[in-house]
Amino acid sequence: LKIGQIWTKQAKIKGRAMKTYPVNEAHRLETGQLNMPPRLLLGPGPSNAHPRVLQAISNQQIGHLDPAFIGVMNDIQEMLRYTWQTSNPFTLPVSGTGSAAMEATLANLVEPGDVVLVGVIGYFGERLVDMAGRYGADVRRVERPWGEVLSLDDISQALDEHKPAILALVHAETSTGALQPMDGVAELCRAHNCLLLIDTVTSLATAPIFLDEWGVDAAYSCSQKGLSCPPGASPFSFNERALAKLDRRQGKVPNWYLDMTTLANYWDGKTRSYHHTAPINSMYALREGLRLVVEEGLNERWARHQANAELLWDGLAALGLSCHVKEPANRIPALTTVRVPDGVDAKAVAGRLLNEYNIEVAGGFGQLAGKVWRVGLMGFNSRKENVTLLLAALKEIL
């Protein structure tokens, strides 16, 4: 007899036959316990979660309005302010990946017809262009070749020409490894009465960021890179200028799930009214990841990422390999793009690293497909022993 038939024959409760239904058993897959292979994740994200984060995420679930969970929310908000160096009250994690946080900034700030100027220096600038356009923005571009950064003069001229409501920049362009300088940008934005929005997905907790000092109005990030957490709870911050634009909207935010005018009632520290069920265990993980940042200290953490990046760059040079971003000051400490030598199959090398050494690195995509490897040293994974292991494996393969 099949499992379903046996159950039907035996199902009786207190002497009365249990009602059964014809169930299609075709997709009743019997599987073993999940056991994933050990990987050293040295790609552009996710990074390996810190052991303490994995322990935190296994805590008992409680309700998203439980007073104990409200305490978790408060801790996350305050530690995010430290990590971003901001006093913005409206700082919180979005339920979703970094792409959800990216969309949240645009959904709340962009109204149809708004001129949005996007700095395009790689794939994620292109994504900002796409997203802003979907919300009805009149999107303009200021761009440089993939691997370069925008100069202050580039930005100034574009602001003069386009007079945008919002300037959106990718601080750390994960597709190219380029770190966009921010000095002087906010002053230009203020002079043109536009908001400054930045993507810090790969730079949060890995490179110096000062939202308040830089005059950033809106920012977003993710949990699975520099914070060494699983994906699912993504930092988001608006200052008073951004909130004022949100308050002036002529219509509703065209995305219910990410509407900060209603989410605010859950995160404002007062009302705590239901909007949606928060990813409880992902929030546990984020809290622990932020605790690790606080314990280490920002200067120490930034210095660790920079030192290990330089160790990697020197080791790559010794192997005859070069970085795609030529100027070291413009390289992301947590993400290095390595030029693939002529005659070398980038995908084959990455495959051998994974299959023979359990090391994951990523290839390029978009304009850099097949031309670079992307190597991440993020958060918990930014350690000297990981650099040494990767360089030794590359030496053997190449």
Regions found by a protein language model. Name each.
Residues P38-S95, S99:
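A glycine-/small-polar-enriched, mobile loop at the entrance of the PLP active site in fold-type I
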Residues D212-Q224:
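Conserved active-site segment immediately N-terminal to the catalytic lysine
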